[in-house]
UniProtKB/Swiss-Prot annotation:
Main location as per UniProt: cytoplasm
CDD domains, sorted: PBP2_HisGL3
Organism in which the protein naturally occurs: Koribacter versatilis (strain Ellin345)
Official protein name in the record: ATP phosphoribosyltransferase
CC terms in the record's Gene Ontology section: cytoplasm
Activity regulation, free text: Feedback inhibited by histidine.
Amino acid sequence: MKLRLGIPKGSLQEATIALFLRAGLTVHTSTRSYTATTDDAEVECMLIRAQEMARYVSKGVLDAGITGMDWVVESGLEVEAVSSLNYSKQSRGNVRWVLAVPEDSPYQRAEDLAGKVIATELVNVTSRYFAARGVPVKIEFSWGATEIKPPTLADAIVEVTETGSSLRANRLRIIDEVMPSSTQLIANVSAMQDDFKRKKVENLALMLEGAIAAQGRVGLMLNVRKGDLANALAVLPALNSPTISPLNDGEWVAVNTIIEETAAWTIIPRLKAANATGIVEYPLNKVVL
């Protein structure tokens, strides 16, 4: 038996494969194939567009897949959300679908767009957004390059953004947030009733979450006399309580902890000033909480 897993093809593909590698699973792809292999003989992968992932997972064509919550909501299909994975194509953060208009337009809020044309890939969510506000608009599906459509081809757009740089580059101004979205590991409801598949999905979630948690963090080891331990611990903003282990010399202990990588620059000199020795900073692959 194998777990059939969907990998998002397109903008999320590179970031997803890199995340899998950090989690310990290498995904081998080919430019001429929509299938992929992994180092785990019990997992077979298909490259599927994120927009279609929920469809194939809900049908059982795939047991699980990675996609955005936006596309799950847009599809309206029943799948099980297993894990929220805090990464996107450019960063460790989530994304937003926003309502944007030309910088020099008079529109300041959604209600100002009554009777206007809205271009978007997220048609169903956008329809519900305007319907909830009682604003009649004409929503047109956009096949991409949505940012270039106002003002000639559309009066406004609903588009996804991470940093807002693409919108600014196209002289667009955000007037509202339609919905936030995050990357999700989703699964077929029936597949999660199968012991083998459920365990594979849960283990996959555990390892991916661990790889994400390790990003931007480093491990720190040091030795310190018991008499200086309190001062050394006061320097450490630990993820949890630091691990303290006795050394052969009963007057000394070893301290092991996790810190933000950017904090190491200031913390290590302060530890040295607190009489810590043998300070070692090391990279992390996974942090399983």
